[in-house]
Swiss-Prot record:
Protein name: Dermonecrotic toxin SpeSicTox-betaIIA2iii
Gene Ontology MF terms: lyase activity; metal ion binding; phosphoric diester hydrolase activity; toxin activity
Disulfide bonds: C45-C51, C47-C190
Family under the similarity heading: Belongs to the arthropod phospholipase D family. Class II subfamily.
Function: Dermonecrotic toxins cleave the phosphodiester linkage between the phosphate and headgroup of certain phospholipids (sphingolipid and lysolipid substrates), forming an alcohol (often choline) and a cyclic phosphate. This toxin acts on sphingomyelin (SM). It may also act on ceramide phosphoethanolamine (CPE), lysophosphatidylcholine (LPC) and lysophosphatidylethanolamine (LPE), but not on lysophosphatidylserine (LPS), and lysophosphatidylglycerol (LPG). It acts by transphosphatidylation, releasing exclusively cyclic phosphate products as second products.
Cofactor: Mg(2+)
Cofactor detail note: Binds 1 Mg(2+) ion per subunit.
Enzyme class: lyase
Length: 275
């Protein structure tokens, strides 16, 4: 996956897809009651980026639905995954359940259209800290209560706070979640980051029978050299401010026969087995 980072304004969606992204990440900002209002990051944010771009979340979901609905004039076949960077760390953990209900409901109403020609992209729920795990419970409860559990097939989970991998596994066990799990590792592009935890995550992913990591991505990469480093380690995805650089690196001789950009025919929840 070549994931565009911080794609918060509606006009940025096509901008990032034009640069070669096949997935986009956007920030979901909540009010104090856990109601998801805007796609907005705010200050401070990644180096060299404007932090203040935003959209009303429901309008954003309406737009990306069109972009991911075959037959729609706005349809772009390359967009296969939407990563929701849920800014739960800005609200109290007690509101994580309410937030999960709200996000699930908004996806049902504005993205999936409750089964009436909704968008087809996979959804990755990026949760900053394990303490906010109630969000996942609420999200799944809501799909069940609303009679739309079929969308679980499209939804994955990812804890993004670089916490201890075994702690993350314990929380997933507690939730009864052992599939559709991504593991991100990274830091804002302003700072360098070593590969120790990334390697551990990849090791777990590649352990036969280990269910709690099926895919790993590194974020937020801007330098081609760091993209190469991550690809050599065998990541499943890269989140970048410059998706066109990722495309370029993937075309290099060293990588072109090992990697390709994922398409909708690929399953984002299955462990990748090299040929």
């Amino acid at each position: 996956l070549d994931m565009g980072h911080m794609v918060n304004a509606i006009e940025q969606v096509d901008e990032f897809l034009d640069l070669g992204a096949n997935a986009i990440e956007f920030d979901v900002d909540f009010d104090d009651d856990g109601v998801a209002k805007y796609t907005h990051h705010g200050i401070p944010c990644d180096c060299g980026r404007l932090c203040t771009k935003y959209a009303v979340l429901t309008e954003y979901l309406d737009y990306v639905r069109q972009v991911t609905t075959p037959g729609d004039p706005k349809f772009r076949k390359e967009l296969v995954l939407l990563a929701l960077d849920l800014k739960l760390q800005r609200i109290s953990s007690e509101k994580a359940y309410a937030a999960g209900v709200d996000v699930a409901t908004k996806l049902l109403d504005h993205y999936w259209m409750r089964g009436w020609n909704g968008g087809r992209a996979y959804i990755l729920l990026n949760i900053p800290l394990v303490e906010d795990y109630e969000f996942i419970r609420a999200f799944k409860d809501t799909l069940r209560k609303e009679g739309h559990e079929q969308y679980n097939a499209k939804v994955g989970i990812n804890f993004t706070g670089n916490e201890d991998l075994d702690e993350i596994r314990e929380v997933l066990e507690k939730l009864g979640e052992d599939e559709h799990i991504w593991q991100a590792d990274g830091i804002t592009s302003c700072f360098p980051r070593g590969t120790e935890r990334l390697k551990k995550a990849l090791e777990k992913r590649d352990t036969p029978g280990y269910k709690y990591i099926s895919k790993v991505y590194a974020w937020t990469l801007v330098r081609s050299s760091i993209m190469r480093r991550s690809l050599r380690l065998g990541v499943d995805g890269v989140m970048s401010n410059y998706p066109d650089r990722v495309v370029k690196v993937l075309k290099e001789k060293e990588f072109s026969d090992k990697f390709r950009l994922a398409t909708y025919a690929d399953n984002p929840w299955e462990k990748f087995t090299p040929i």
